[in-house]
Amino acid sequence: MLLPMKESKRKRYCQGLFAFLVIAITLSGLLRTAFWPKDVNTYESRNANKPEAFTVGNYLSGVFQDSMEKALADQVPFAQYFKKVFNILRFQYYRFMLLPKAEQHPELCFHYKGIGLIDGYMVHKPADLSENIEIMLSLAHKRADDMRACREINPETEYYLFYIESDRDYDFETAEKKDTYGFITENMEIPADRTGRLCVDNLEDYKKIYFKTDHHWNCYGAYEGYRGLMTLLGVEEKLLEPVETASDPLWWAGSKAAEVGFREYKEPFPICRYEYPPMEIFINGSPSDMLEPQEAFFSGEMDSISYGDYYGGIEGEVILDTNRPERKNILLLGDSFDNAIRKLVASHFNKTFSVDERTYEEDRGEPFILAEYVRKNDIDIVVYDGDILAFSGDAFL
């Protein structure tokens, strides 16, 4: 009789200890969420979710409850660790069940959680222009109005559009292509000889330009984009060429892999070295030497990498000054695709201004008004560039 009693007592003790740990972790998560929320979700490389302010309006509309649920998923201790373990196990299952089929039939597109996998490349579903028609029209008309207002103050300034096609423009299963470029150029009212694009007309085009697991272009795609943009702008001097390409690149997993929880699906991160002219770089007004740390990479000082780590994150304003006043000043108005070509473009100009309208006001403390910015900085050339997200996101309005 004594043995069963001891086992029963031990069982109750273990149950009580487990319940205590669960309650302790939950309470610590609630306290952390309410009073000391962390700013960054390091596992997913994004800003951590935080709860909205508790107000009657937020509570009745459900905004507070939804934000609290998302915040707890980020703030509770060990949440990222458990998510990582879960994603690793899920990836192993995915690799065991689906990847062999994908490898046997590279011409087919296999779908998982909104992402397609074709010949080893993760691809998004092509954009449905009808779903974003109002935002795209509003943004195109706003930019057309901005250029008209700018011409009244700065009649000498030239305006260009350079569009970067992606998997959101081309359906690899049906070989159908969206005419996003035509829609944008028509509604922004930029003359045809001032517009250009980097085309994706088939899977082979896409594979040359983009990462397997990320929505950004790789260094080869960025270089082709740079060449295309310089041709559009009529730059006649010799373009920069890579002097070295990484023979032993670091491996990483990009945004698409993170989107479906497959951080273990890694690929090489190719890097090209260029001989840039001397330039001073300012990020949101502060001097910086963190864009494209070529020496650190090629000397082996970097042990991990991502698109943002190497080319820079989302910044409201980046200025690259080569101190050659006899040359023109250029303004790039785009998104994070610009990050990989800023220094290449800057090599041909006096000052290169790169503005991301999504975060400019927050980072610089004032709204972005094109006419005033062009006048203040003596801009000669304005380029609207990017993929479809730069022309369909309400954050740019």
State the predicted function of each range:
Residues 1-397:
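Extracellular glycan-modifying ectodomains
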